[in-house]
Regions:
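Catalytic cores and adjacent flexible loops of soluble metabolic enzymes
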Residues: 2-8, 17-338
Length: 338
């Protein structure tokens, strides 16, 4: 059980949450008085989660070039593709060609999503060295997203994880709808904790808690993490925020204050969810990096190169970037040329 003290004090009528961080994490102090991680690992999910909902099929070569560009930014984890049925997610039908076509950097992991044992076997045959399973804290969302109940999904994931253990392949776990569901609305933190705990105990080395529809606030993020951290160690947790309500960065900041040091994001803010209509993209990698670097938190990632990769994929998709940082820098460059 993961536990550390969290208590509330009143200072001039303002409530402040103060906590004692776990000893295995190294923190740096900031001017806010909160303790933050000195280093944050960014998990780039743009090539998979960011592109899976595109209506027009993105050429395989474009996907490969995007991943190759991201591999040169300093990112240590890039989620490459998803080994799901092309019937359910046509955009990912070229998963084998993508995984085999990218120039794999020695210092980068390229996990792929594998919803079941067949997907895992196909991924391994294509050269996957890390996989991920995608669960949900919502029964309704689970049935619409992966066509089975939460309990049934756990049986599938157990097969995948056991097979991965035999091959010494690490498995990452996702819990969607951690802060709300498009069908059920509010999701109790205890339900999120239950699913996260089951995935962790099965053998997932890291559990990413997803605000699938971007409805969370710092308050709901705080309550959810406090509950989940009773069952899963803080160093095994990550957050995955969508920016539908413009709350992604505040939510990430709250997670950092709680001790989370792994953040999922997507280049250019790509994304959405095919089973959560109306949800906007993931928080942009560029914006997360700008915030973290401005706080003195190291990531090892070159923001300029990420912006370049974002410009490439947005040009390929004929759309404007969702990254506020990229937009601002583009405007500044245009103004400077006048």
């Amino acid at each position: 059980m993961a536990d550390f003290s969290v208590f509330c004090v009143l200072l001039s009528g303002v409530s402040l949450f103060i906590y004692s961080p776990p000893p295995h994490l190294i923190f740096s102090q900031t001017i806010t008085g909160h303790a933050y991680p000195e280093f944050v690992k960014i998990v780039e999910v743009g090539p998979r989660d960011g592109l899976q909902n595109e209506k027009e099929i993105v050429p395989t070569g474009v996907k490969i070039q995007l991943i190759d560009m991201l591999s040169g930014t300093g990112l240590s984890v890039i989620e490459a593709t998803s080994f799901v049925s092309s019937k359910w997610v046509p955009q990912m039908a070229d998963h084998t060609d993508v995984l085999r076509g990218i120039q794999k950097a020695s210092n980068v992991q390229y996990p792929v999503l594998t919803p079941n044992l067949q997907g895992f076997q196909d991924a391994v045959a294509a050269g996957a060295t890390e996989v991920a399973v995608f669960g949900s804290a919502s029964e309704t969302f689970s049935k619409k997203n992966i066509n089975c109940s939460v309990d049934e999904s756990m049986l599938r994931f157990e097969e995948v994880i056991n097979a991965a253990k035999k091959r010494q392949i690490p498995v990452r776990g996702y819990v969607s709808c951690a802060l709300g569901c498009p069908h059920e609305g509010h999701i109790e933190p205890s339900k999120v904790a239950e699913v996260a705990k089951r995935l962790y105990e099965m053998g997932c080395y890291e559990i990413s808690l997803g605000d699938t529809i971007g409805i969370g606030t710092p308050g709901s993020m705080l309550k959810m993490l406090q509950r989940v951290m009773k069952d899963v160690p803080i160093n095994a947790l990550a957050v995955h925020c969508h920016d539908t309500y413009g709350q992604a960065l505040p939510n990430i900041l709250t997670a950092l204050q709680m001790g989370v040091s792994v953040v999922d994001s997507a280049v250019a803010g790509l994304g959405g969810c095919p089973y959560a209509q109306g949800s906007s993209g993931n928080v942009s990698t560029e914006d997360v990096l700008y915030m973290l670097h401005g706080m003195g938190i190291e990531t090892g990632v070159n923001i300029a190169k990420v912006i370049e990769a974002g410009s490439f994929i947005c040009s390929a998709l004929s759309r404007k970037t969702n990254s506020k940082v990229a937009q601002a820098r583009s405007t500044a460059c245009c103004d400077a040329s006048l």
